[in-house]
Amino acid sequence: SFSVNPAVDILQHRYMEKVAQNNRNFLNRV
């Protein structure tokens, strides 16, 4: 992420981790 605000970087990182986890759960269900 290219944000100047470190808080936004943290939020983006957490969001990407959540998305990745959701993708893994989806793949496991299929």
Curated annotation (Swiss-Prot):
Subcellular location(s) per record: Secreted
Keywords from the UniProt entry: Amidation, Hormone, Secreted
Domain of life where this protein originates: Eukaryota
InterPro entries per UniProt: CRF (IPR000187)
Sequence positions bearing Valine amide: 30
Segments passing through the bilayer: none
Gene Ontology CC, one term: extracellular region
Gene Ontology molecular-function annotations: hormone activity
Main function: Regulation of fluid secretion.
Family: Belongs to the sauvagine/corticotropin-releasing factor/urotensin I family.
Protein name in the entry: Diuretic hormone 2
Species of origin: Manduca sexta
